[in-house]
Amino acid sequence: MNINVTLIGQTVAFIIFVWFCMKFVWPPLMNAIEERQKRIADGLADADRAVKDLELAQAKATDQLKEAKATANEIIEQANKRKAQIVDEAKAEADAERAKIIAQGKAEIEAERNRVKEDLRKQVAALAIAGAEKILERSIDEAAHSDIVNKLVAEI
């Protein structure tokens, strides 16, 4: 192969071109590539962080939901206990009131019965006195006496 001036000139021009590219073109390209790599790496890191934050938020939301359900169940349980307590208290009050009313009614019935007995005793006594007066006013004969006693028995 022949080495001539043209080949040497082309080689020198190529070396100058490579040097020029290495000096002025290559560093900005490398900076742009490195910046892009950094942005991509930052974007991926942000995406990973966002995924972790999302998972953490979902876990926290799940925990809060479980806690809220537990609190709601506790409140419902307390309400049911309170309801049962109120119902029991109302039943006890109703039973006490019923017993009181029954006792009052029995006392009133007993008092009325005693009053009626007393009235009957007074009436029987009055009738007996009236019968005795009638018997004493009339002459004592067997037929009149029997008739008065029968009338008294019918009135009683």
UniProtKB/Swiss-Prot annotation:
Keyword vocabulary terms for this entry: ATP synthesis, Cell inner membrane, Cell membrane, CF(0), Hydrogen ion transport, Ion transport, Membrane, Transmembrane, Transmembrane helix, Transport
Compartments where located: Cell inner membrane
Biological role: F(1)F(0) ATP synthase produces ATP from ADP in the presence of a proton or sodium gradient. F-type ATPases consist of two structural domains, F(1) containing the extramembraneous catalytic core and F(0) containing the membrane proton channel, linked together by a central stalk and a peripheral stalk. During catalysis, ATP synthesis in the catalytic domain of F(1) is coupled via a rotary mechanism of the central stalk subunits to proton translocation. Component of the F(0) channel, it forms part of the peripheral stalk, linking F(1) to F(0).
Principal subcellular localisation of the protein: membrane
Secreted among keywords: no
PANTHER family: ATP SYNTHASE SUBUNIT B, ATP SYNTHASE SUBUNIT B', CHLOROPLASTIC
NCBIfam families assigned: ATP_synt_b, PRK05759.1-2, PRK05759.1-4
Family to which the UniProt record says this protein belongs: Belongs to the ATPase B chain family.
One term of GO molecular function: proton-transporting ATPase activity, rotational mechanism
Name of this chain's protein: ATP synthase subunit b
Regions that span the bilayer: 5-25
Gene assigned in the entry: atpF
GO cellular component: plasma membrane; proton-transporting ATP synthase complex
Classification via Gene3D superfamilies: 6.10.250.1580
Subunit structure: F-type ATPases have 2 components, F(1) - the catalytic core - and F(0) - the membrane proton channel. F(1) has five subunits: alpha(3), beta(3), gamma(1), delta(1), epsilon(1). F(0) has three main subunits: a(1), b(2) and c(10-14). The alpha and beta chains form an alternating ring which encloses part of the gamma chain. F(1) is attached to F(0) by a central stalk formed by the gamma and epsilon chains, while a peripheral stalk is formed by the delta and b chains.
Membrane topology classification: Single-pass membrane protein
